[in-house]
Curated annotation (Swiss-Prot):
One of the primary rRNA binding proteins, it binds specifically to the 5'-end of 16S ribosomal RNA. GO terms for biological process: translation. This is Small ribosomal subunit protein uS17. GO terms for molecular function: rRNA binding; structural constituent of ribosome. Keywords: Ribonucleoprotein, Ribosomal protein, RNA-binding, rRNA-binding. One of its GO terms (cellular component) is cytosolic small ribosomal subunit. Pfam families: Ribosomal_S17. PANTHER family: 40S RIBOSOMAL PROTEIN S11 FAMILY MEMBER (PTHR10744), SMALL RIBOSOMAL SUBUNIT PROTEIN US17M (PTHR10744:SF1).
Length: 79
């Protein structure tokens, strides 16, 4: 099974070797047929503490690193 890759914005970088990434998804509401935005936060591994708040990054699913971390940052898309 291939690893999932998501794109989001870094919203937290206070933890050592960890960033919090907000991933937003859009979908059509089943009743109203209006586009709805929902977001979810993922903790991702950042080995060199190189990503800062506001950076757009891609994260990839990986084996569990800690209780909450199951994602690792693979690339930055820009600010």
């Amino acid at each position: 099974m291939p690893k999932r890759i998501l794109q989001g914005v870094v919203v937290g970088d206070k933890n050592e070797k960890t960033v919090v990434v907000r991933v937003e998804r859009r979908f059509a509401h089943p009743l109203l047929q209006k586009t709805v935005r929902r977001s979810k936060k993922y903790k991702a591994h950042d080995e060199n503490n190189e990503y800062k708040i506001g950076d757009t990054v891609s994260i990839e699913e990986c084996a569990p690193i800690s209780k909450d971390k199951r994602w690792t940052v693979i690339a930055a898309q820009g600010k």
